[in-house]
């Protein structure tokens, strides 16, 4: 989110065919809720293209990239690593500490979101293993709640630059405005 140290989301693991929609939604959620970029495994090219297309149409800044070195990406990260897992410490117990590291200590934050069985190395590399409710549910829901807690709701007021289209909020119906006609 602009004005803060970087927040990146790393999708750890992707099963083509099975995880395509979920991986795409991890990227879209990261973009919509204040992250600066998402990094997908190199076999998630379809998701990368979809998120890049949405960013082009609805604005950024937001970067999307692929890597074939997930463990190295975590190991080489130059800031705090938060691994979202239902087995982690309760988000409400650690959110203040993580928010302080990000905003006061100016540390970039990498949020690791698992897509399949995450190896124990990831748990060990993480500065925080964080659970949202410590119950089984969607990793997209966990990411959304975590980012909202990290940014304390400020991401909901986000402005998007260089958009071709904009959704016009309405009580009823759908309205999308083409901005290049203005």
Regions found by a protein language model. Name each.
Residues 122-171:
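Structured adenosyl-cofactor binding patch, chiefly the S-adenosyl-L-methionine
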Residues 36-44:
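Short internal beta-strands
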Residues 12-14, 84-87, 113-116, 133-134, ...:
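Fold-independent oxyanion-binding glycine-rich loops
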Residues 35, 77-79, 126-127:
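Short, well-ordered alpha-helix to beta-strand connector turns
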Residues 38, 81, 129-131:
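Short, well-ordered beta-strand core segments
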Residues 6-13, 109-111:
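Short, hydrophobic/glycine-enriched beta-strand segments
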Residues 1-10, 18-26, 31, 46-49, ...:
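Haloarchaeal acidic low-complexity proteome signature biased toward cell-envelope/secretome components but also
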Residues 48-121:
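S-adenosyl-L-methionine/SAH cofactor-binding core of RNA-modifying enzymes
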């Amino acid at each position: 989110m602009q004005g803060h140290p970087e927040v990146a989301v790393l999708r750890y693991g992707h099963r083509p065919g099975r995880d395509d929609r979920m991986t795409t939604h991890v990227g879209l959620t990261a973009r919509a809720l204040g992250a600066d970029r998402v990094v997908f495994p190199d076999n998630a090219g379809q998701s990368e293209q979809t998120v890049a297309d949405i960013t082009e149409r609805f604005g950024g800044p937001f970067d999307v990239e692929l890597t074939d070195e997930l463990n190295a990406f975590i190991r080489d990260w130059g800031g705090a690593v938060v691994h979202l897992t239902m087995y982690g410490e309760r988000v409400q117990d650690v959110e203040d500490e993580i928010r302080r590291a990000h905003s006061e200590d100016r540390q970039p934050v990498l949020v690791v979101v698992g897509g399949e069985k995450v190896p124990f190395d990831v748990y060990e590399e993480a500065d925080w293993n964080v659970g949202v409710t410590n119950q089984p549910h969607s990793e997209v829901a966990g990411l959304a709640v975590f980012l909202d807690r990290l940014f304390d709701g400020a991401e909901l007021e986000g402005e998007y630059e260089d958009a071709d289209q904009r959704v016009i909020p309405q009580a009823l119906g759908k309205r999308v405005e083409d901005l290049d006609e203005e």
